[in-house]
């Protein structure tokens, strides 16, 4: 562990107002110190490194020029907000980032008045900013609203919907396009290509060359002034105008996002111009700027674990089992080797979802559509129409963004699209914005859709094979973040019978019915209950929909207590089981049914096991639910023979 960086100027900054009297040279020094502080802090906590390093100068310049928090700065996604937090009175807590009870890794309204809008998902900043701009204008407040959005986020349609609206409304809104040429995976699609062309367009280069020839003939003082003016005017003359101008934005840029002497004058000019209508400032930055390991491998330093500042080497605990993501990726490649119709679709997350393995093995059969979940789902529906077998791999929380497409374009038409839902359940340090806790509730209500939930990595392998062979309609498989439980994965996984669960452990009196990875907690609860003379039956539902009615009826008939356990929100598996048991009259005989699910509230960042404990779905909570149902004290034992056999 290295000593903390020396930051004499940063030590004097208590908030953004302290930056407003600084010179450009002092702002440059402050940026260097903020960068050093951020690197040191993230080396301790882990988190999103590359994005924040790329916007240090921009962050300092924004808080120097604008009157925050009265003026609003909205950070799209929020990955890049660490320098912002350091400058806005949270430096003393910056080494608690993403820790339980510590600072959020994203902007959070409850955390600071300098966070006017919460973030976590991409492409929301312009819409929120436009709403704030119009709301402020209606209230008679003359404040500035700045939305900072990355080039990767500009691949989502929502950003253009907002820009189209802003241009038509002629509202005063400042959008800063942070063009670092790098989202988590290289940005894809027409937008990124357009930005690259903008920087090197023939029309611009020819004009610039002519201007340089003229400027070279001027006296030295005029030449220097003209060169500076030329730097600030880049991009404003591009022949036929720009896409942004067509949307009604006044375009400024591109400018160097690491030159304080470029940023400050441009931001100040835009602020003081008082122009009606939206403005877009195109700022070019480098992801990972100022830290060589992150500059050289920006994809590896987007999100990091704890690391050595000097070497850049990240701490990696030796895995006890392969991750669920890795298992999915490996099994999908194996299935694709046997069936040329299998293709993969991801929304800018090939590495995060394991589809990078498919892209390596079969590059023509893997499609990264950018941050565009709605498009990804309907694109997959089109692939299915042509006889292909698309696997759409998305994080659970991001699938929410394409829900209408799931309903209207896939499920309603019974198209055989396969949804691989990663990060299902609690996700730990990424907190509420990334928690995958709602998918069972919003998918379980859809006709025609099969939903599988993996209890361990071996089950996941079987579910990939099951999905690959399911051609009669859409099917989803959900699995959590992190490592598996260490069970052996079959070399040749066999498909599961649709809608059939399994008994994992036979017992009597009490039945624990788990879906997904809560199975391990149920088995742990059995060990605790054994000390009290109880031997519960443990079952794995496997399928949310259709669930195994025969299995549920059997458990209800043979036990006095049935505990349903899920790592999902209210309205999920437990609700389906309770409704079915009620309608079948299987609760009329006195069966004690309890449903353990995530309570009706959001859970902020913490270790997943802590989140589960707080939610009341861990082994201890299951044990308590059993004892409460039997009306036993937690220290009591029971005569097992008295329970229903």
Swiss-Prot record:
UniProtKB keywords: Isoprene biosynthesis, Magnesium, Metal-binding, Thiamine biosynthesis, Thiamine pyrophosphate, Transferase
Cofactor binding note of this UniProt entry: Binds 1 Mg(2+) ion per subunit.
Oligomeric and partner information: Homodimer.
GO terms, molecular function: 1-deoxy-D-xylulose-5-phosphate synthase activity; magnesium ion binding; thiamine pyrophosphate binding
Enzyme Commission number(s) from the entry: 2.2.1.7
Family, per entry: Belongs to the transketolase family. DXPS subfamily.
Pathway field: Metabolic intermediate biosynthesis; 1-deoxy-D-xylulose 5-phosphate biosynthesis; 1-deoxy-D-xylulose 5-phosphate from D-glyceraldehyde 3-phosphate and pyruvate: step 1/1
Catalytic activity: D-glyceraldehyde 3-phosphate + pyruvate + H(+) = 1-deoxy-D-xylulose 5-phosphate + CO2
Role of this protein: Catalyzes the acyloin condensation reaction between C atoms 2 and 3 of pyruvate and glyceraldehyde 3-phosphate to yield 1-deoxy-D-xylulose-5-phosphate (DXP).
A GO BP entry: glyceraldehyde-3-phosphate metabolic process
HAMAP family: DXP_synth
PANTHER family: 1-D-DEOXYXYLULOSE 5-PHOSPHATE SYNTHASE-RELATED, 1-DEOXY-D-XYLULOSE-5-PHOSPHATE SYNTHASE, CHLOROPLASTIC
Protein known as: 1-deoxy-D-xylulose-5-phosphate synthase 1
SUPFAM superfamilies: Thiamin diphosphate-binding fold (THDP-binding), TK C-terminal domain-like
Organism: Rhodospirillum rubrum (strain ATCC 11170 / ATH 1.1.1 / DSM 467 / LMG 4362 / NCIMB 8255 / S1)
Cofactor: Mg(2+); thiamine diphosphate
Pfam families (UniProt xref): DXP_synthase_N (PF13292), Transket_pyr (PF02779), Transketolase_C (PF02780)
NCBIfam families tied to this protein: dxs, PRK05444.2-2
Amino-acid positions noted as binding thiamine diphosphate in the UniProt annotation, renumbered to this chain: 79, 120-122, 152-153, 180, 291, 373
Transferase listed as a keyword: yes
Gene: dxs1
Binding site for Mg(2+): 151, 180
InterPro entries: Dxylulose-5-P_synthase, THDP-binding, Transketo_C/PFOR_II, Transketolase-like_Pyr-bd, Transketolase_BS, Transketolase_C, Transketolase_CS
């Amino acid at each position: 562990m290295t000593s903390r960086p020396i930051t004499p100027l940063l030590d004097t900054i208590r908030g953004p107002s302290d930056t407003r009297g600084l010179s450009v040279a002092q702002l440059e020094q402050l940026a260097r110190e903020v960068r050093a502080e951020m690197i040191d802090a993230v080396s301790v906590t882990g988190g999103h490194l590359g994005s924040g390093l790329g916007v240090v100068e921009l962050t300092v310049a924004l808080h120097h020029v604008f009157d925050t928090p009265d003026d609003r700065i909205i950070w799209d996604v929020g990955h890049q907000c660490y320098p912002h937090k350091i400058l806005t009175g949270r430096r003393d807590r910056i080494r608690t980032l993403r820790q339980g009870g510590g600072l959020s890794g994203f902007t959070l309204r409850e955390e600071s008045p300098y966070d006017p809008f919460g973030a976590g998902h991409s492409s929301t900043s312009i819409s929120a900013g436009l709403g704030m701009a119009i709301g402020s204008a209606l209230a008679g407040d003359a404040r500035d609203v700045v939305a900072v959005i990355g080039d990767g986020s500009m691949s989502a349609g929502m950003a253009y919907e907002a820009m189209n609206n802003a241009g038509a409304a002629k509202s005063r809104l400042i959008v800063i396009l942070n063009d670092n040429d790098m989202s988590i995976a290289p940005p894809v699609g027409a937008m990124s290509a357009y930005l690259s062309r903008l920087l090197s367009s023939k029309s611009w280069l020819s004009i610039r060359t002519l201007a340089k020839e003229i400027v070279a003939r001027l006296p030295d003082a005029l030449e220097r002034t003209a060169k500076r003016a030329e730097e600030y005017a880049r991009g404003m003359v591009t022949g036929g105008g720009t896409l942004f101008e067509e949307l009604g934005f006044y375009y400024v840029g591109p400018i160097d996002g690491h030159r304080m002497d470029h940023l400050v004058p441009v931001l100040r000019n835009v602020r003081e111009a008082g122009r009606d209508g939206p403005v877009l400032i195109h700022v070019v930055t480098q992801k990972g700027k100022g830290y060589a390991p992150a500059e050289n491998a920006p994809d590896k330093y987007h999100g990091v674990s704890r690391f050595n500042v000097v070497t850049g080497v990240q701490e990696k605990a030796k895995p006890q089992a392969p991750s669920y993501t890795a298992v999915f990726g490996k099994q999908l490649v194996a299935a694709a080797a046997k069936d040329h119709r299998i293709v993969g679709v991801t929304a800018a997350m090939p590495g995060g979802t394991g589809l990078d393995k498919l892209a390596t093995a079969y590059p023509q059969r893997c499609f990264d559509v950018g941050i565009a979940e709605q498009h990804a789902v309907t694109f997959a529906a089109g692939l299915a129409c042509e006889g292909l077998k698309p696997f759409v791999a998305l994080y659970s929380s991001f699938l929410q963004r394409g829900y209408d497409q799931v309903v209207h374009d896939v499920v309603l038409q019974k198209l055989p699209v396969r949804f691989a839902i990663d990060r299902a359940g609690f996700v730990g340090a990424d907190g509420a914005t990334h928690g995958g806790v709602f998918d069972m509730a919003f998918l379980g209500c859809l006709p025609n859709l099969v939903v599988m939930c993996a209890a361990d990595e071996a089950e996941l392998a079987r579910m990939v094979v099951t999905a690959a062979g399911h051609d009669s309609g859409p099917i989803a498989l959900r699995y959590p973040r992190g490592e598996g439980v260490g069970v052996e994965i079959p070399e040749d996984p066999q498909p599961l019978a649709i809608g059939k669960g399994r008994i994992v452990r036979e017992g009597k009196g009490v039945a624990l019915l788990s879906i997904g990875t809560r199975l391990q907690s149920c088995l742990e609860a059995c060990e605790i209950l054994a000390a009290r003379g109880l031997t519960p039956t443990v079952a794995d539902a496997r399928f949310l929909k259709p669930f195994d009615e025969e299995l549920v009826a059997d458990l209800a008939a043979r036990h006095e207590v049935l505990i349903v356990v899920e790592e999902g929100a209210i309205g999920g598996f437990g609700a389906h089981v309770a409704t079915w048991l009620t309608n079948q009259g299987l609760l009329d005989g006195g069966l004690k049914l309890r449903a353990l699910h995530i309570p009706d509230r959001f859970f902020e960042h913490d270790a997943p096991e802590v989140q589960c404990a707080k939610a009341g779905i861990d082994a201890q909570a299951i044990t308590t639910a059993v004892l409460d149902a039997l009306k036993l004290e937690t220290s009591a034992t029971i005569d097992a023979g008295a329970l229903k056999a």
